[in-house]
């Protein structure tokens, strides 16, 4: 047992008391928006509009504690038992686990040096009742290849044509490293 004299108990008690009083005074102990801080969601929506040209509002943003929670929540909303979810041949396995937990049938599609094989995606969409595709097009995980722009556009066309959701894990878009 550590020597109790080493612990600044009075100092800690004062700090805890002040934090609790401040929280009570500012109503910080009440329930918050489950989607996350409104200020943070507003800042992210602004960044996505400015840097990526996406037309989003803070209401389109939900802050999670990590990509796995985000994928799981998305899967719970979109996937019904028996729906097919397309995943790249090599992919983020925890996402596959989230889709399976929702009763999805996992269908693997090809991947090459230019990203997901869109011809393979189209074949799968014609063969299965596909609800979604999970992709990491910027730096594909785990290969790090980037999907060519023409393939990205074709994937969006197929999403409209077949009514499937594109679930993109853009885990490191803002990271850029020198050669």
Model-derived segments and spans:
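Conserved core of the PLP fold type I
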Residues: 16, 21-163, 173-178
């Amino acid at each position: 047992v550590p020597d109790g004299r080493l612990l600044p108990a009075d100092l800690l008690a004062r700090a805890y008391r002040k934090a609790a009083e401040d929280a009570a005074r500012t109503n910080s102990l009440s329930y918050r928006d489950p989607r996350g801080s409104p200020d943070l969601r507003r800042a992210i929506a602004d960044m996505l509009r400015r840097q990526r040209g996406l037309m989003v509002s803070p209401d389109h943003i939900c802050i999670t504690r990590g990509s796995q929670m985000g994928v799981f929540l998305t899967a719970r909303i979109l996937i019904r038992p028996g729906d097919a979810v397309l995943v790249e041949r090599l992919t983020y396995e925890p996402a596959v686990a989230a889709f399976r937990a929702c009763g999805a049938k996992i269908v693997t599609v090809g991947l090459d040096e230019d990203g997901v094989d869109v011809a393979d995606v189209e074949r799968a969409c014609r063969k299965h009742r596909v609800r979604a595709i999970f992709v990491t097009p910027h730096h594909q995980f785990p290969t790090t290849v980037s999907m060519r722009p023409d393939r990205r556009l074709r994937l969006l066309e197929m999403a409209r044509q077949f009514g499937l959701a594109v679930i993109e894990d853009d885990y490191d878009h803002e990271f850029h490293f020198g050669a």
